[in-house]
Amino acid sequence: MQTSPDMFINRELSWLRFNSRVLDQCSKNLPLLEKLKFIAIYCTNLDEFYMIRVAGLKQLFSAGVNASSSDEMTPLQQLKAIRKYLHQEKELLERYFNEITSELEKENLFIKHYENLDENLKQKCDEYFFSNIFPVIVPIAVDATHPFPHLNNLSFSLAVKICDKAHPELVKFGMIRIPRVLPRFYEVSANIYVPIESIVHQHAEEIFPGYKLLASAAFRVTRNADMVIEEEEADDFMMILEQGLKLRRKGAFVRLQIQKDADEQIVEFLNTHMKIFHKDVYEYSILLNLPSLWQIAGNKTFTHLLSPLYTPKTLPPFDENLSIFDAVEKEDILIIQPFESFDPVYKFIKEASKDPEVISIRMTLYRVEKNSNIVQALIDAASDGKQVTVMVELKARFDEENNLHWAKALENAGAHVIYGITGFKVHAKVSQVIRKQGDKLKFYMHLSTGNYNASSAKIYTDVSYFTSKAEFARDTTSFFHILSGFSKNRRLQTLSMSPNQIKEKVLEMIRIETSKKNEGVIVAKMNSLVDSDIIQALYEASMEGVQIDLIIRGICCLKPDEEYSKNIRVRSIIGKYLEHARVFYFKHSEPNYFISSADWMPRNLERRLELMTPIYDERSKAKLAQFLRLQLSDNVLAYKLKNNGEYEKIPSSEKIIDSQQTLEEYVSKIYKTLKKDTDQSRATHLASKLFKEN
C-alpha cells in the first residue's frame, strides 16, 4: 500500500489537541478544585511542549530542514500552526480560569490581589513582605553598567519602569526576580490567597529606594530545555551529563508570557533583550505561572470541592502475612494500578533486600521520586552485601538531577550502577530477584508499563506483572547482561525488546490478523501512535476487514474514518488518573495479550531499550480483557477521533460508564467481599471471578 502525506495527522497538532482535552475537563461537572488541577496540568504540559517540541522546531527551521514529519509539514508551517492554535486557545483558558475562580468565590475561597484586601489583611501582607519576601527577592537594575541578567527557565519576575524621584525625566528599567523558594500565593487567611507579585508590586518603591514606580508587569520566560549529549565521546557520562544540565539553563528563549495591557516600553525592553519572536509572546488577562495552582487545589480545608479520595487496594493472592515470593511462585499475578495498590511492587524489593536467601537484585530505574523507599531498599540490600545491579537512566528528561543523586547514593552503598547504553535511552520497567534455595537458584520477575515511583503510581493507570516462569527468568537475565556488558545480540526469545524486535513482533501480529480478514480483531491501548510503518500496516488490515479499536490517550497520527481506515476506531480517555498503560490484544496470535513499556513511536521502537511482555496466565488475560472492555465502553471520559484530527465527546447512553470510577468500585467491592475471608486459595479464586463477572 502506498501512503501519502494526507493520510497522516500532524504529530504536534495531535499533541495540542490532547492538551485541549485536558483543558476541556474544566467544562465538565467536576468539583471546582479538580478543575483547577486540570488548568495546572494543562499549563505544565504546555511548558514542556514549548521547552522541547517548539524549541526543536525552531532549531530545525534555523538549520534549513524542509520536512520533519510524516505529513510533510515543514518546521515553519508547524510553528505557524502551533502559534495560531495556542493564541486562540489562550482565550478559552482565560474564560475557564475566570469562571472557576468566580465559582470558588461563591464557596468562600478567594484569589485576591493586594489592593482588594481590607486594611487588616493588607497589614498582614506588609508584615509577610518584610519578614519573608524582602530578604530573598533580587532587585535588578538594567543599564550600561548592569547588563540584562540571566533568567532561569520558567522563572517568574516583575519587570519595572521607574524614575528618579529627584529627576523624574530619568526613566530606568529593571526587574524583581521572585525566587522559587517563595510560594506562588501568600495564604493571608484560611480562605484567601494573595498572588505574590501583587505584594511585590505594592512594595516596589521600597525595593528601589529613591525611585518612583511608573509601571510594572509580571512576566515568565521559557527556554529551550532539550539537551544534546555526545555520548560516543564521553569517557565519564555522569560528568558530561552534569555539564549538559548547566548548559541547559542557558538555552535560547522560546516564549515570553506577560500580563495583558503591560506598559509598551516594558514589553519593548524585554523583547529587545530576549529577542523573542513576537508571535511567541503571549499576553494574559489572568494570572501567570498557573502550574502553581496546585498550592490552592491541594487545600484540604475545602474537601467538598475535591473528588472523594480513593485508596488503592491490595487483593489476593497478595497478603500481608504471606511472602511475596511464595505468592509469585504459585502463580503469575497481574495488577492494575492505581485501582490496585502499588504496595506489592515495593514489598517485592523490600522483602528481597531483607531476605537472607536473596543473592541478587536487578532493576531498571527511569523516573524515581525524590524520597524513594524502593531505592532505599536497594541501598540497604547493597549495604548488606547483596549483589545489586541498577540501571539508572540518567537521560530521563527533567529527572536527570534526581537520577544523578540516586545513582551516586547507590554506588556509595556498593551497588553496581549502569548509566545506560550509548545512543539509547533505557525505558524498560523490569526487576529481577534471585534467591538461592539449597543448591538451586529461584528467579522472580516484575515487569511493568509504569515507573518504580510510588507517587506517580497513585495517579497513573499502569499494569504490573509478577512471574517466576523460567522463560521470563532466561530473558530478563539476558536483558540485564545486555545492559551491563557488551552484546551484539539484542534479541530475546519470549519477551520482545526494542530497538527493532518489538516493532517486528507488532507488525507480524498485525499481518496475522490481516490474513484472517473479517475474522481479525486488534485492540491496542497506548499513550501515542506515531510510527508510520505500523500505521500503514493498520490501514492495510482495515482494508481487509480487520476490526481495530485503538485507545490512545495522547498523540495519534493515524486518520480514522477514511476509505482505507473505515474499520478503525480511535478513542482517547482523559480522567483524574493519567492513562499510562500499554496493553495490546491480537485475536489470532498465541499468546494474544501483551503489556509493554513502549508506545508505537519511532523513539520507543528504534531509539530506546523497551520490553514487551506476553501474558500467558488465564486469570491475568481475563483481567486485561475486562480492562479493555471497560475502556471501550466508557462514555464519560472518552473522546472520539475524527478524520480531520479533531476530537468529539462520545455521547452518553442510558447506562453511564466512567471506566476509572467503575474500576474503583469493582476493586472496592472485591476488597470488601474478601476482607474477612481467611481461605487464601478461595479468596484468590473469588477475586478473579468477581473481576471477570463485573
Curated annotation (Swiss-Prot):
UniProt's post-translational modification comment states: An intermediate of this reaction is the autophosphorylated ppk in which a phosphate is covalently linked to a histidine residue through a N-P bond.
Active-site residues? H427 (phosphohistidine intermediate)
Its signal peptide is none
Q: Which residues bind ATP?
A: N45, Y460, R553, H580
Q: Which GO terms describe its biological process?
A: polyphosphate biosynthetic process
Keyword annotations: ATP-binding, Kinase, Magnesium, Metal-binding, Nucleotide-binding, Phosphoprotein, Transferase
Q: Which SUPFAM superfamilies match?
A: Phospholipase D/nuclease (SSF56024), PHP14-like (SSF143724), PPK N-terminal domain-like (SSF140356)
Is the keyword ATP-binding in the record? yes
Q: Report the domain of life of the source organism.
A: Bacteria
Names of the cofactor(s): Mg(2+)
Q: Which family does it belong to?
A: Belongs to the polyphosphate kinase 1 (PPK1) family.
Q: What does this protein do?
A: Catalyzes the reversible transfer of the terminal phosphate of ATP to form a long-chain polyphosphate (polyP).
Protein name as catalogued: Polyphosphate kinase
Q: Which organism is this protein's natural source?
A: Campylobacter jejuni (strain RM1221)
